[in-house]
Amino acid sequence: MAIHKIKFFAGRGSRYLAEKIVASYGTTLGNSEVQQFSDGEFQPCFNESIRGCTVFIIQSTFPPLDNLMELLMMIDAARRASAYKVIAVMPYFGWARQDRKDRPRVPIGAKLVANMLVAAGVDRIMTMDLHADQIQGFFDVPVDALYASGIFVPYIKSLNIEEIGRASCRERVFVPV
């Protein structure tokens, strides 16, 4: 079985998180940039070869529109640059609350976003705390839906806070000086 080099890249919406992720792996982010045009359009570019590599693109889709479009374009660029696999790491999956039709003549936004990611060429999705588990079924590629509660709940319990969630009135009320 061939071993493919792994490279990590960050979208502009998740650079801080991406730097923390790669630091924990003892590596650095790959070299990429986004060219901004005067009309508001932008064009991501990988400034190093990713041919044959497994590429992780770390990008939240909040605020959704520009970050989602940047992620889609980075996926497409990676695919066109002959990446072996393209994995989108999406800490926040925008439009996830639109997981069903709740009234007539409305879209199912989560399914549309899933279709766009697959059409762009993603091979796998990693995301956190999806609004609804059924969203995983909207994709034609594997989805790793991770849950922060597995990390946060044990930590919070370890603090031994007796009255968690019950702040005193004095702590919640702003009193001007």
Language-model-detected regions and their locations in the chain:
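PRPP-associated nucleotide enzymes
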Residues: 1-172
